[in-house]
Amino acid sequence: MSLPHSLFLVIFGASGDLTRRKLMPALIKIHNGKRFPEHFAIIGCARTAYTDETYRAYLKEELIKSGSLTKEEMETLDDFLSTVHYQSMDPADETTYSLLNDRLKELSPQYENNGNYLFYLATPPLLYELIPKYLHDAGLLKKPGLKRIIVEKPFGYDLASAQKLNKIYAAYFKEEDIYRIDHFLGKETVQNIMVTRFGSTIYEPIWNRNYIDHVEITAVENMGIGTRGGYYDGAGALRDMVQNHLMQLLAITAMEPPAKFDKNGFRNEVIKVYQSLRPLTDEYIRDNVVRGQYIAGDDRIGYREEKNVHPDSRTDTYVAMCLYVDNWRWQGVPFYIRTGKQMPTKVTEIVIHFKPAPMQMFQMKEGLYKGEELIIRIQPDEGILQRIAMKEPGAGFYMGTMEMDFSYDQHDQETGDAYVRLLEDSLAGDPTLFTRSDAVDESWTYFDKILDYWKKHPETPLYGYPAGTWGPKEADVLINRSHAEWTNPCKNLTHSNLYSKL
C-alpha cells in the first residue's frame, strides 16, 4: 500500500463534533509528520454557510480552545489550515451535490488531482444510505481516479438494516474501498495484543483452553449519555458497544494467527471467531445475558431523567454476558464481556485468567490462590500487567502475588491516536484494520437473536443500578457461576485490584 500522488479528503459533517474533536486534531498530526500525499487537500461539507476563510478561522479557534495542540502543532497550524477548503451544501439534499462536484473540479488543477477522492461520513447514520447514491448520481464516482469511503459506526441498527447498507455500498464501491471504521482497532494497545500473543514465546504456547480458565473484557464509562439521548434511547448498550467494539476485542483475543498479516489474512481470522461463537437459544440468552439501566445515585440523575429519553424507557445502558468460542483452542473457556454507562470509572481492558497449578503445594495466608492474571489495559493508563505467584517474605512457604507491569506513560512512550492510524491507513489504501462486510453480517446475525428475544419477551428483567456503581448484582451472579469475580479496576493500571476511582 502506498500514498497516491494526489488526493482529496471530502468530509461530510465538517461542522460537527466528530470533525472538530477527532478528525482535525488527527489530520494535523499526519500533516506534521509529512505523511499526506504530495498533493493533498481537505474539503469540508456541511449546511453551515462558511467560506474557506471563515471555516479555517472557525477550526483555528476551536483547535486552540481545545488545548490539545502541541507547541509544534500551534506553529504549523496555519500551514495545515491552508490545505482546508469548504463547500456549503446539504448532504441530505441531492440537488446540492452538483455544487460539490463543481468545487472539486475547480480545485483539481491546483492539486494535480485526477479524480482521487476519499469521502468521510462524519454524519448522522440516517444519511449513510443516501450519500453513496447521491455521490454516484452527481458523477462524483466516475473514473478515472480512486474512490474510497469511510463510514463511522453504527453500521446498521440490526441485521436487516446492516445488510441493506452493505448492498447499497457494494453497488457503488468495491469492498476493498469501503472503510467501516472502529476506532478501537486503531489503538496501539489493541494492536499490541496480537504482538503479545503471536510474537511472544512466553504467551503463545499457553494461549488456549489448557492454561486459560476464563477471560474478562470490560469497556465502561463513568459518564451518562450527555446530549445523545435522542440517538441512545433508540440504540442502547448492546448496539452501541457490544456488537462492534467488544466483539472486535473478543476476536483479537481469540483469533488464530493469520497466515499473513494483511487485509484478508487478519480479517479472515476475525470471521472465523464470529462463526465459532456458541449459538444463542432463548434459554441461553435468558441464563447468560444481563441487561441494566442506571438509576439516580451519588448526585447523578437516572437514565430516564436524561434529556430526550422517554420517561418509561426500557433501553439498556449496561450489558454483561457470557460467551463461548466453540473451537479446538477455546472449547469450554467462558468469555465474560460487559459494558455500561455511569460506572465508577472509565476503563477498557482485557483480563486473561490463567488456571492454577494442578496441585496446590503452597498455601496463601488468606483465601485460595486462583491463578495468575494478565491484564491488557486499552485505556486509560495504557499498558500490560502480569500478576504472578511469589513466595511471601519471611518464615514458611506462603504464596503471594507480585505485579510486573509495563505502562506507556511511565516509559514516555506515546500510544498515538487511533484516528491518526486509521486515517493514515485509509489514505494509503490499507483496509486491514477496518471491518469487512461479512464481519458486519456475522456480528449482527449473532446479536439480532438477543434483540429479538428482548422484543418477544418484554418481561425480560431490566435491572436498575445506581449511577456510580459497577452495575446490577445479577452480573456478579453470572460470573460467580465460574467461581470467578469481575475485576473492577481503577484508572491506574498498577494495583488496580486495590481501589477504584469513584
Tell me the role of every PLM-derived stretch.
Residues 1-151, 155-502:
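Secretory/organelle targeting and membrane-embedding segments
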